[in-house]
Each structure stands twice: as C-alpha cells, then as structure tokens.
Amino acid sequence: MRQEDIGQDGDQRLLAGLTGKIQTVTGLIDPEMLGVCLTHEHLLIDLSDLLPPPNTATARAFYARPVSAEAAAYCRNYSEFGTAHHALDSVETAVEELGLFKQYGGQAMVDLTLASIYRDPVGLQRISRAAGVHVVMGCGFYVAATHPPALSDWNEQQIAAMIVADIVEGAAAEEESRSTGKGVVYRKNTGVRAGVIGEIGCSSPLHDDERKGCVRPRGPNGKPVLVFSS
C-alpha cells in the first residue's frame, strides 16, 4: 500500500467496498449472518515472549513440566506456568472446540491475536472452514512490550498504512516475521483480511507507542477498535 493512499480520502476509497459488511477470514458476509458471536477470543496464540521462565531452580523445574491434573491448582493461580501453558497452537483442537460452540448455537467468533503474539491468518482460515463458523481476525499492535523495536520510529501514518493493508490487502505471513526477527517487517501476503482493529494493548500508564498505534486508523476506516487494558 502506498503511503499516499493512506489518509482520509485514500482510506475511504480503498474501504468503500466494505461498507455494511462484516469481513471474515473467508470473505465478506452480511451482518445478519454473524448471529451468536464471541467478541474476544484466541484460537491460535503464543505468549511465550511475555512470560519468561522463573529465576529459581525449583520453580524452573516445575515450569518445564507439561500441564497436568497434578499441576492444575498451580496453573489456576499462576498463568505463567509452563511452556505448554503459553500457547494454543493446534488447528485440530480449535476445530473441535468451535464445533461444540456451533453445536450450541454459536455462529461467529472474533480472534484478537496480533502479529507480535504470533497471529496465524492461514490457520484461522483453515479453522473457520473446517468448523463452519465465521471467524473475524484482528490487526494492529498489542502492548508495548511486544512491539517490534522499529515501531518507536514509525509515525502514525506508517502505522495506519500497516493496519489498513491488513484490512484491505490481507495480512502478512507471521511465520516469516517470526523467523527473521520482530524488527523486520515482511509483507508476504496471505490474502486473509482482518475485520477489526485489536486487541490494542493499553499498559498502565499508557505507553506513547500504544496511543499512536490505533488512534489514526480508526477514524477514516470505521472499523471497531478492541482494547486490552492492564
């Protein structure tokens, strides 16, 4: 997306075709097709970067164990338990669970996993098709601790360009970004388009980069913004 296309007039032109529609990972649908919808879920996610191992020997040994009934009480009290507790990475499990959701009347789900916590656009598309449930994908930037280092140097227009590109052109393949480091942005387009902005991270106090990360794109494109506050 060209920088000159980002701005109120450019955004309106590029996004005009989305007016009155819901954009899912498999395409546009009419709002009445959304039905019963969960608005903040994570079908595929990896929070490992936010939850480093503990710093004592006994805690590290416990941390390395798989999630089990024996460790259930610890898991409930300490969300940082174990590497296996940090990620949802099974398409098959997600399809199975969405099948149960559909069985009880669910029709749609909004997945708010972002690139810095390893969004998987193609995985979400596979899940949606296999389960027969509409999935709306988020875009934007999570809490500042997960931002690519270069984001501090980007202006609002550059950030807006990336967000609007996810909505209009399609999201990048995040495995490409992950393997080359978060400081490098690659636009290997998957063709899977975002339908909402978020979840935008809001630390306490709010970081300057978090503030500029969603304010500008919201105005011209009319997409809802979902936030996470800590």
Residue ranges and their predicted role:
Residues 40, 109, 141:
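Divalent metal-coordination and catalytic microenvironments
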Residues 2, 7-77:
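N-terminal basic, low-complexity leaders that serve as flexible interaction/assembly modules and, when applicable
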Residues 114, 140, 230:
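Short, ordered loop/turn segments at secondary-structure junctions
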Residues 44-46, 115-119, 144-145, 203-205:
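Active-site environment of divalent metal-dependent phosphoester hydrolases
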Residues 126-145:
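Long, hydrophobic, well-ordered secondary-structure blocks that form the structural core
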Residues 68-95, 113-116, 199-206:
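Divalent metal-binding segments
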Residues 45-88, 139-160, 189-193:
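Active-site gating loops and adjacent loop-to-helix segments of metal-dependent hydrolytic enzymes
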Residues 23-24, 29-32, 95-103, 107, ...:
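Histidine/acidic residue-rich metal-binding segments in metalloenzymes
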